[in-house]
Amino acid sequence: MTIASAASKVILFGEHAVVYGRPAVAVPVSEVRAWAEVTTVLSDRGILIHAEDLGRSFRLDDPPDETILPLQEAVRNTVRTLHFPVEALSLEVRLRSRVPMARGMGSGASVATALVRAVGKHLCHDMDPAQASALVFQVERILHGTPSGIDNTVIAYEKPLWYRQGEVIFLRLGEPLHLVIGDSGTPSRTRDTVAHVRTQYQADPATVEAIFDAIARCVEAGREALEQGNPITLGGLLSENHALLQRLGVSSEKLDTLVMAARRAGALGAKLTGGGGGGCMLALAFEEDVPAISEALKAAGAQNVYYTMVM
């Protein structure tokens, strides 16, 4: 048996604006992961995949649907990249994940990264981050249509990064980040929120461009605060970025409630993370304030609360 895992992620700054050429900053969430197990099966020919979180078992050559196609393609592309004949393999794959689906934490990219790593390793090839990221980006295109490339990159490398149109700069943090993540319990439909912003942009490009420019300034100032280890400044910038996302119309009443609850409980700053419309928010905290903020988010209706320290 071969086992591999992958982290999830949150975007600190730059959602939506990144699609229009502005930068973004994202960090891995190492404590919330997906796993893949691959076993050689001697009694059967073909590749059988068990996706526990989907409640589905299917074969690689089964007729695809929108749920299983990304996983089928992840396996198929990995095997082809390593120059193995797909039809000659007899494998059983099991997938499980703690990453909530459709919440802006990169669940699809996380599962796909664990999957390509496990398949590659089982076929005697340790997948380097660049290879894994490239393979998972193909999966992201199936999942999201026009992905930014952030999810597959930050998850494959499991490092904080600055990103713009394929350009990546890995960040060295001045001090660890303590992040509390609250799940609103409502799915975030990235395609829908991206389409909403596109409609706004087409209707009033000057106003939306100005918002994107303001978000870009948050990104660059946030990057500087991260590298200098300045959590007070960083927290203020997170809250500013949230206000700009509200102006784009991609927040929700539930997300705003959680953001305010975190701030009242002592968070240095808080914002939605990911596509918005649902999904998750994050709060920056001093370590000693993490328990109080976590409890405040639960009391405000968060479905789940996660804590991660980013170094």
Question: What residue spans do the PLM features occupy?
Answer:
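Glycine-rich nucleotide-binding loop
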Residues: 90, 276-278
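Gly/Ser-rich catalytic/binding loops embedded in alpha/beta enzyme cores
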Residues: 30
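Glycine/charged-rich beta-loop-alpha catalytic/anionic-binding loops adjacent to active sites
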Residues: 89-101
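C-terminal nucleotide
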Residues: 1-13, 17-19, 26, 35-83, ...
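Short aromatic/hydrophobic contact patches that present stacked aromatics
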Residues: 104, 280-282
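DPxDG-like acidic metal-binding loop motif
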Residues: 103-128
